[in-house]
């Protein structure tokens, strides 16, 4: 079994029946799974991790998560959602081993929504900041090095496109 939500330490037993599994991501070496759950069906997503080599769910949790993807090794990148509007507005790099996190991108404009993805060759993480009328694209290398994860702008925002 990939995940038994009864084993997730941060889900209260009384909310198990109302908890939705939102999705999974698997690390390149298949040793770690990142999963997202909506605890109590509140439309607020929490991410957790399972070590597939030991079969144990880690106690680590990330709150107000939008997208989550693996970098290299045990590093993940995720979008964090605003507590009031649930709008994904920043990208955080998180090291599952150490618990260290760093915000690498933030868009404070309340009309912009941020999402992330990986290029097909798995070399870069793509950061999109979108509205219904415009967008801009940033990229960062998919690496464990903290210095190399600062994004650079690939496509500048153009209004009314």
Regions found by a protein language model. Give the residues of each.
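Beta-propeller folds
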Residues: 1-161
């Amino acid at each position: 079994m990939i995940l038994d939500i009864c084993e997730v330490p941060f889900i209260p037993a009384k909310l198990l029946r109302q908890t939705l599994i939102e999705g999974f991501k698997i690390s390149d070496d298949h040793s770690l799974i990142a999963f997202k759950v909506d605890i109590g069906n509140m439309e607020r997503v929490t991410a957790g991790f399972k070590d597939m080599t030991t079969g144990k769910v880690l106690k680590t949790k990330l709150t107000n998560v939008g997208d989550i993807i693996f970098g290299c090794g045990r590093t993940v990148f995720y979008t964090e959602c605003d507590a009031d509007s649930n709008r994904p507005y920043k990208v955080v790099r998180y090291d599952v081993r150490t618990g260290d996190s760093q915000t690498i991108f933030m868009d404070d404009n309340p009309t912009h929504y941020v999402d992330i993805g990986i290029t097909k060759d798995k070399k870069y993480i793509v950061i999109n900041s979108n509205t219904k009328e415009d967008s801009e694209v940033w990229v960062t290398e998919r690496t464990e090095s903290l210095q190399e994860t600062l994004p650079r702008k690939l496509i500048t925002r153009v209004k009314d496109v």
